[in-house]
Amino acid sequence: MGVTYVEGVLTGPTGKHATVRFWVDSGATYTLVPHDVSKTLDLAPKRTVAFTLADGTTIERAVSECHLALPEGEGHTPVILGEAGDEALLGVVTLEIFGLILHPFERTLEPMRMLLA
């Protein structure tokens, strides 16, 4: 199993932006923005959500939203506001919003087959 990273540019509500190297995690629901980046972008918490980790433990994190530009497209997405030690993750909600999938063998982002149903 390989690890895939992609670089993206996040823009906050005040127009500040930051370039982030995301680990593409097809097992993560939401995209996670590291603590220092969320502070730089002035991202404000909109709600708190409980997340279950791979080991079964549950943590709570604040969720916000911001604009994300990837080489494959751009748009708004919900993001988890990370805490110290949290790594930048690109989750499946963002991938679906952008109409992308992680190719399991090539380890690349590719357009997904979109359904209108």
Model segments located where?
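Pepsin/retropepsin-fold aspartyl endopeptidases
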Residues: 1-117
